[in-house]
Swiss-Prot record:
Gene name of this polypeptide: glyQ
Enzyme class: ligase
Disulfide bonds: none
UniProt entry keywords in alphabetical sequence: Aminoacyl-tRNA synthetase, ATP-binding, Cytoplasm, Ligase, Nucleotide-binding, Protein biosynthesis
Protein name: Glycine--tRNA ligase alpha subunit
Subunit composition and interactions: Tetramer of two alpha and two beta subunits.
Amino acid sequence: MKKLSFQQIILTLQNYWQDYGCGILQPYDAHVGAGTFHPATVLRCLGTKPWSVAYVQPSRRPGDSRYGMHPNRMQHYYQFQVILKPSPDDIQDLYLKNLECLGIDLKNHDIRFVEDDWESPTLGASGLGWEVWCDGMEVSQFTYMQQIGGIECRPVACEITYGLERLALYIQGVDVVKALDWNGQIGEKALKYGEVDFEAERQFSKYNLELADSKMLLRHFKDSEEQCERLVKANLPMPAYDECLKASHYFNQLNALGVISVTERASYVLRVRHLARICCMKWLELSGE
């Protein structure tokens, strides 16, 4: 079987979960640190209404900036997120069948579910979880979402997160992200991951670690914090949550610059968590839950 390209992996995941009945959503147009931060997870996992969706989410972690020189760590990367609420009883079987669709023969590989409970301090979110290892390499994360914004999830939703670069490294049998086959073409039409993303990786690394203006970021954080609280009071939790995401990203940028002390870091985490919580509470209130 021909090894899937990066974009074929995404299309295969989308088709598989679409056939299961998930709505295929688009990436959220904001700077987020992980697919979990998409409002389709944070807001929609709350409340009692069923919700089954899947989407790709480009994600940014300024602290992982390496100027494009690290084999598998970048400040910008892609995740594929699946949310199933309520969680189906056969979720593990569904996941394993999905691996087979990606060309991973379960009979010839060691698939393990390794307990790894998940927590996001800035979202006030946590859940029971497992890393999925294939021949000793983590390829996905399972989480039974128990709370978001400090609010209990009823019913519990299942979140499956695929680290697309890591999954592609395994499927294609290469060691360096920039060498990944992006589009499955040959000759002039062939694209490697490095051709698509690595100049941006170099430039954003320089910005994140050297040129970002910490005083400006501190002002922006405070502005987004105030705006979020104002919008919640105006019964607009969705634009308020956008401001929460901005504040979270500004915090991550400040952290990458190394200008926040350990004590200050804890304070900033609590401030972002408060914003996430009031957005979630207002969302539930307006939903009649």
